[in-house]
């Protein structure tokens, strides 16, 4: 799509979450918590706060962040190929995260290193608890063709800002057969959206 005023090519935007979407944060953090606590948490990794009291949970999460564990989080299969493919299709890729950039000095270096190690291609990174509100102030919301996110509450925010059609939930939708089940399938879904944008 070209701008009618300046003739400049306007690229479609794809927003990709990191933790739980491109990287296997949940099981990685759970494994860390087992070692940090010296025992398994009271509940599985998919239960809020692992069943721990809030003080203990926050202390554990802070230790995870300060210990550079974000660098060693496993990448989900196909995340690197997904970003390379989206880039080849002309998408502008925004990596979005709620990681607390301003509170911990190592968050940006650890994030950048994780992206580098896994060859994740991107144009911009947003660190913000309100990451999708931030994105909506930086790009025209109409340019956002896809938001790939694992957390339902973040999906709800993105839907309000970018419309129902733009949001793709990384988990749970596939159980109801309403969304792809893995990143490779997500790639083809998002590629089709980019194709529609370009038409």
Give the ranges of each region predicted by the language model.
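Short, acidic loop-to-helix structural element flanking the phosphoryl-transfer center
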Residues: 62-95, 103-112
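Structural recognition of alpha->loop->beta junctions
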Residues: 111-126, 178-199
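Active-site neighborhood of HAD-like aspartate-dependent phosphohydrolases
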Residues: 6-62
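Substrate-recognition "cap/lid" segment bordering the active-site pocket of phosphatases
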Residues: 100-145, 152-157
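Acidic, Mg2+-coordinating phosphoryl-transfer loop and its flanking beta/alpha structural elements
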Residues: 146-188
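Short cysteine-rich clusters marking metal-coordination/redox-active sites
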Residues: 3
């Amino acid at each position: 799509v070209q701008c009618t005023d300046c003739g400049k090519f306007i690229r479609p935007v794809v927003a990709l979450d990191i933790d739980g979407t491109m990287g296997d944060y949940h099981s990685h953090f759970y494994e860390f918590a087992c070692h940090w606590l010296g025992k398994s948490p009271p509940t599985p990794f998919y239960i809020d706060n692992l069943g721990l009291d809030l003080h203990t949970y926050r202390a554990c999460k802070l230790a995870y962040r300060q210990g550079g564990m974000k660098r060693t989080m496993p990448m989900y299969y196909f995340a690197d190929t997904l970003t390379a493919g989206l880039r080849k299709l002309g998408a502008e890729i925004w990596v979005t995260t709620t990681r607390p950039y301003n509170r911990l000095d190592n968050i940006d270096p650890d994030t950048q290193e994780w992206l580098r190690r896994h060859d994740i291609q991107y144009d911009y990174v947003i660190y913000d608890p309100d990451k999708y509100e931030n994105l909506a102030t930086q790009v025209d919301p109409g340019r956002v063709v896809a938001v790939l996110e694992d957390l339902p509450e973040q999906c709800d925010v993105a839907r309000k800002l970018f419309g129902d059609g733009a949001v793709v939930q990384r988990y749970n939708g596939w159980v109801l057969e309403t969304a792809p089940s893995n990143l490779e399938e997500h790639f083809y879904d998002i590629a089709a959206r980019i194709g529609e944008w370009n038409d």
